[in-house]
Amino acid sequence: MLLASKTKAFYGLQGEQIYGAAEQVKEEIPTGEGALAETFALKKDTEDGQDGVAEKKESDGEDRGKAEVRDKTEVRDKKEGKEQTEAGKGTEEKQEEAEAKQSAEAKQGSDAKQDTTKGKEENGNFETDAEGNLQIKKADKAENVAGEQIGSLYLNGESAYELFYFSEKAVRAHASLLNTVQAMFPKVKLSAMIVPNSFGVILDPKVQEKLASSGMDQAIAYSYSLMDKRVNTVNVFDALSAHKKEYIYFRTDHHWTQLGAYYAYQEYCKSMGYSTKPLSDYQKLDFPEFYGTFYFFMNRPESLKGHPDQVTAYQGSMNTMQYTDSKGNLQEGKLINYASQMLPGNKYNCFMLGDHGYVEIHNEGAPRKKSILVLKDSYGNAFVPLLAQDYRDVYVVDYRHYQGNASSLIQEKGIEEILFLNNIMGIGESLSQKMLAVFQ
């Protein structure tokens, strides 16, 4: 998994390690604003049984060819299979889960692939401690480890990072998705939040350049320039960069901390003209000894082993939710959960008990008498509990697990706002089709 010395020398690095990477050809990010990304004009199923076909058009309505959109049922049937993270043209981690009640060993690997690679959708959970063996087994949703694909990883001392490489196809596809949904619901306020990872925000730009990486801030700005001007684009890169010396990302895991999510929430509210509660209004809960996805993927490096993360959660007065379980039944749960007894690899699940296809939160005392739909990946788990303090009705869809129809949900619930919250490594061509499928 560790790169050969000649590849390491190619990057011009000393004393660092790169995992699961291949020599990358840097794709330049276009300067200035690009032309608006094409939209998908959705069609009903054809009479000959070929479902899910869409015509690809420019925003002004001119035909620009056709693109296939996966049949929604087929997409959902693949939940036990794979999940893609292609925006960074990173490599993929493949894990084969062996089910056993007593123990199971994880076989991990990675392939260097381009934008359209398929990753893994995680349905098991990590069970381990700093000394123990990594085990993956089926578990309740309360113990699931939320995770996106881990691509090329870079280890520098006590911190690990996931490398980012720009892909024109990936960001344009994501912009097309947002433009399509805006066209479908012209009266709904639509927002896009592309969340940078720790590599783009924390790591020295000079080191990024040595790794032949692309400018993440430029990539996000370019993606936003391709979106319909009605879409509210939220610049969280600058907001997070202003706090880069604070604990806004985990060092052993690919997620942000809830402190990072709070700064992003502040920026979202600012873009919408809303006020936010200070952190002093929340109850602070600390859960030490957290080892995240980077730690396990890198086979427990000593530099990370001796410096575990701490999960800090901010619990507001609204702390209840309803979520669908694996059988589609609506269950009661908490937005912030006590994680001290969770296994070291599971403690990010203190936020919303991990990933669920559908969540409802109702807060009659909220200052905003509005309803919002959040379409998210696992970065949203730390974000939604903050949002829930301020909105009367919050509906959350995780496109990787959702079994319903988001278009029907918007109409039935009278949803007024939609927020797409996706981390930078979780956007791309096929993922955009998968997100679009939940609206059909």
Language-model segments: residues:
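Extracellular glycan-modifying ectodomains
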Residues: 1-440
